[in-house]
Amino acid sequence: MIMAGGTGGHVFPGLAVARSMQANGWRIVWLGTRNGMEAALVPQHGFSIELINFSGLRGKKLSSYLLLPWRLAQACWQSFRILRRQQPQVVLGMGGYPALPGGIMAVLLGKPLLIHEQNRIAGLTNKILAKIADRILLAFPGALTSPENKTRVTGNPVRTEIARLPSPEARYAHRTGNLHILVVGGSLGAQVLNTVLPQALSMIPEDQRPYVTHQSGKAHLDALQQAYADHGVTGNLVAFIENMAAHYQDCDLVICRAGALTISELAAAGVASILIPYPYAVDDHQTANARFLSDYQAAVLWPQSELTAASLAQWLMTCSRAQLQSMATHARALAMPEAAQTVAEACQQLSGQTNEA
């Protein structure tokens, strides 16, 4: 059983593990929440899902905290019934709301429990479950403090097509002409990127101006198209990108937020990046994520408070493709492309080598 929900940063790595395990003959059942993206996304990928009622609390009203014991008890009871019915041989918590009650009940029912932490600063669910889990898997060293014999650094599971891209040397070496930039705001878009990018491009002489693919998020596409038009610049403007591997392969530079899965994809693909962490992320974990690349000259960490159109335009005009190739090579050196298979193997080892999860 895989438990994950709430955001793509939990769900997509879980799906990568699920595909790896399914390919080895495992039966996969997912535990998610009714209101999370996993409720629709997991069945679309061909996996069965069981749903409980539970959600996050950070930033909510006092009444939500007062109701927490009741809501957690209800979610634990729902998880208990699902676990009794499904009888998984091993339970993998990938973080997010459903993993807390599911993980607690898995341990009480004597099911082997593994957890996987995607960020450099662990989320609340995994901080709690780390105290009772049989195995702790980490994307980044030091995210959770736990006994060495229980802990293993695996990296973040990413899509196979990204992990199998050609090397940066093969991709960058023969490119000429203006830079190709990929701007990724995530599924909901990043408004600061939608505002700053067209303005910065307008400050670059037309013969030096990069080619841009800009993913805006569905709700912001019309406004982004207007912003590009207002500044007299052009780009390939899209609401959502389905084939990220192809875009990683074709671009010289990615400008994006610093979610854990994004960091792992950039490393696996071997792409240079400017990382602008979301400043209101819980525990500022995106800044910590970004440093995993920037500390090794694999990316530029650019705080949102310091980002201006003029400074970005100047940076883009002075950087060279050779510098970007060097960043991309450093990024690829940090990759752990077999993470999905490594997590799957850890589940199998803990389960006693059966084919039901």
Curated annotation (Swiss-Prot):
EC number(s) per entry: 2.4.1.227
Pfam hit, one: Glyco_tran_28_C
GO cellular component term, pick one: plasma membrane
Keywords: Cell cycle, Cell division, Cell inner membrane, Cell membrane, Cell shape, Cell wall biogenesis/degradation, Glycosyltransferase, Membrane, Peptidoglycan synthesis, Transferase
Binding site for UDP-N-acetyl-alpha-D-glucosamine: T7, G8, G9, N119, R159, S187, I241, Q286
Pathway, per record: Cell wall biogenesis; peptidoglycan biosynthesis
PANTHER family, alphabetized: GLYCOSYLTRANSFERASE (PTHR21015:SF22), UDP-N-ACETYLGLUCOSAMINE--N-ACETYLMURAMYL-(PENTAPEPTIDE) PYROPHOSPHORYL-UNDECAPRENOL N-ACETYLGLUCOSAMINE TRANSFERASE 1 (PTHR21015)
Protein name: UDP-N-acetylglucosamine--N-acetylmuramyl-(pentapeptide) pyrophosphoryl-undecaprenol N-acetylglucosamine transferase
